[in-house]
């Protein structure tokens, strides 16, 4: 249990649910992330390298009025590598922010894995944002690229002229 000082300087225990408990826990919390950590390695690449596991489903795509589709770790890895190469050719570098303006689907998983494996930062943006909200977030984040699909292309194109730092 977390401790906090009382008014009489006698240590008191902050009980779960008490006002100071969350604050004490928050102050004491530290992330324990290894100095060299890549989310794409953990979520995709290590599985894709194993011949047997690479053929196993990584993503199950379910959509109304469509047949369910299964995608393997191998497919995810292959497509993510292709997209990473395209992003690199566009000048995206480690630490750059890449906006991902797509609905939840297999291609969105590919986009995140591609961005993460190259050390860039994937920034999710809702496909429901209007032009002002989208433009503000692209500017404020200093995103260098916005990835979109057919459903969000018009919205991204409508603000692209005002985002000169994008590739």
Task: Give the residues covered by each predicted segment.
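Short, contiguous pre-domain boundary segments
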Residues: 21-29
């Amino acid at each position: 249990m977390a401790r906090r000082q009382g008014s009489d300087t006698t240590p008191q225990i902050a009980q779960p649910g008490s006002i100071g408990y969350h604050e004490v826990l928050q102050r004491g919390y530290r992330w324990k992330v290894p100095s060299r950590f890549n989310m794409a390695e953990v979520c995709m690449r290590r599985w894709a390298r194993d011949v047997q596991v690479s053929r196993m489903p990584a993503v199950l795509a379910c959509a109304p009025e469509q047949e369910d589709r299964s995608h393997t770790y191998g497919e995810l890895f292959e497509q993510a590598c292709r997209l990473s190469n395209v992003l690199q050719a566009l000048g995206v570098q480690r630490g750059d922010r890449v906006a991902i303006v797509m609905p939840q689907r297999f291609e969105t998983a590919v986009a995140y894995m591609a961005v993460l494996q190259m050390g860039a930062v994937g920034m999710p943006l809702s496909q429901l944002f209007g032009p002002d909200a989208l433009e503000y977030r692209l500017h404020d984040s200093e995103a260098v690229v916005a990835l979109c699909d057919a459903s969000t292309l018009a919205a991204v194109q409508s603000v692209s002229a005002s985002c000169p730092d994008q590739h």
